[in-house]
Amino acid sequence: MDFAISGVTDIGIKKTTNQDSLFMCKFQTSFGEAVFSVLCDGMGGLEKGEVASASVITAFEKWAKENISFAFDNNGGINNDFVRSQWNDLIFSLNEKIRLFGRKNGVSLGTTITAIIISQKNYLIVNVGDTRAYAVTDSLYLLTKDQTLVAKEVEEGKLTEEQAENDPRRSILLQCVGASEKVYPEFFFGDVYPD
């Protein structure tokens, strides 16, 4: 299976600064093509969100260049334990660095992150915040869960999906990288099905 990758970020209609950052790469393994991508959205309500998102992208790009050859098992699938451990440690480290930068400079900053590695067999996603990953077939399938107040209330049965769509609190994040002492990345693993 061959992969086609493409990416774009947009400032949107309300912001004055594009706080999004993106890195994508396609590479060859002994089992065929694979893809690594990471997308971050700097916190729109916080100062210097573009600094936070760019620093996370830079760190994940460096991780990919140094570790991508170890990311796959002997059958061409993703080495789930290795990648999860590496990404978890990287996010914890980045969270602390961004927090310290903010304290030192007297600014509030943070970013969401969604990173994915896709092999010929499966995918692994890490997510913090509300940046989403979808599978595109004949329709869209959400692969991640938003870490927002409204999403939590839907999960707990306090709100319906319909109520959540119009809730003014839908953009209140429970998690982002750099804004709080603790960060709780969520991982999503699944199989890849060729067309």
Task: Annotate each predicted stretch with a short phrase.
Residues 1-195:
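PP2C/PPM-type serine/threonine phosphatase catalytic domain
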